[in-house]
Amino acid sequence: MQGLDERLAAVAAFVPLGARLADIGADHAKLPLALAAKGKIARAIAVDVNEGPFEAARRAVRAAGMAQLVEVRLGDGLAALAPGEVDAVAVAGMGGSSITRILADGAAVLQAVETLVLQPQGDAAELRAWLYDNGWHIAEESLVRAGGRLYEVLLARRGKKEKPEPVLLAIGPCLWQEKPPLLKKHIEGLIFRVRRARAGMEKSARARDGAAYRALGEKIAALEEKLIW
């Protein structure tokens, strides 16, 4: 989509047509402005907790002449919204733990939301587990390469489904089912990060004898099994 890099274009692709969108973490309001310019959304509220990005987003919206379609608010996550204002939420470019906290803290607002579009920077397994534990499921996922990095984008919809096994929470259940071209690179990256964490424990005999060290070894083995299909 014009004006968006590959990462944000992948996020935009999952936003439902005609959505009333909240974009948490404004980033100059790039995502809602691009969607509004294409007529893809009914309206949007861009939220940022920091004054600098908030002001930058306000300037971008004014410059684009989109103030009637895109509102910018200063606030912490979903706390800047009233229940019923939006039916879709996008959170991109934050750690999975931070996204999980934003969603957990915004339970009242999420009651009226049907779609979540999430792009976690790490800790995606924790985020996926939270979604399945809290009445959501992963409907679609994509992998995109941008700036030499791989990014995961998740589309979650309301509705409880069976929670995938831990290794698929790490990889992505839809990614595993669809096996896109970048999947092996994605799994190899996960293995590298787990190995690095385990290597950091090897200098301590107590750590090597602990349950956490063994659990990381089991996680590596489970991921390596998924490299063969």
Where are these regions (language model features)?
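S-adenosyl-L-methionine
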Residues: 1-18, 33, 55-84
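C-terminal substrate-binding/active-site "lid" region of AdoMet-derived donor-dependent transferases
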Residues: 105-155
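Conserved class I S-adenosyl-L-methionine
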Residues: 18-27
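Conserved SAM/SAH-binding beta-strand->alpha-helix loop
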Residues: 50-52
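Conserved SAM-binding loop of SAM-dependent methyltransferases across substrates and taxa
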Residues: 28-41
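An accessory alpha-helical subdomain
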Residues: 167-229
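Conserved SAM-binding motif I beta-strand of class I
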Residues: 43-48
